[in-house]
Amino acid sequence: MPMRLQKSTMCGLYAVLELAANPDRQVSAGDIADKYDISLNHLAKVLRALVRARLIESVRGPGGGYRFAGNPKRVTLLDIIALFEDTGLDLQEAASDDHEESRALHKVLRDIDEIAMTTLRSVSITSLLKVIDTERRKTERGPNGASARHSSAGRA
């Protein structure tokens, strides 16, 4: 069962990744919205939350936009996800807690929750950008591993 993230969370992740990948320039909200096919109004709300969290900065004026404000080696997936998601597993303590089965189930679910949090906390923006770069290079090489630029399709 894959992890399901809210639309706001995905927008936040896309925005942070886009800004961290372009540290030398400001990126407009419109550019991010266009690239990821996100509603500009929804993205604006997400960007405000990221600014409040001091993960990104808003740059006003000509050529303005947004830029990443954190240290990409220290900012983690959990830092961003926690802004938009309830990251705690809400296990309702039922009256059946006096049963071994209930206590065991709660323990296992808490352990799973802690593993997920530890994993999200261990993935930095820098490491995710490296994964993206690797995926981009695979796509450029094409399905047979040959570089798309050097394929025989373009030769006479």
From Swiss-Prot:
Keyword check for Nucleus: no
Cystine pairings recorded for this chain: none
Record keywords: DNA-binding
Gene Ontology cellular-component terms listed: cytosol
Pfam families: Rrf2
InterPro entries registered for this protein in UniProt: TR_Rrf2-type_CS, Tscrpt_reg_Rrf2, WH-like_DNA-bd_sf, WH_DNA-bd_sf
Compositional bias annotation for Low complexity: 145-156
Region (Disordered): 136-156
Cleaved signal peptide residues: none
GO molecular function: DNA binding; DNA-binding transcription factor activity
Residues in HTH rrf2-type domain copies: 4-130
Keyword DNA-binding: yes
Domain of life: Bacteria
Protein name listed in UniProt: Putative HTH-type transcriptional regulator BadM
Biological classification of the source: Bacteria, Pseudomonadati, Pseudomonadota, Alphaproteobacteria, Hyphomicrobiales
Gene name of the encoded protein: badM
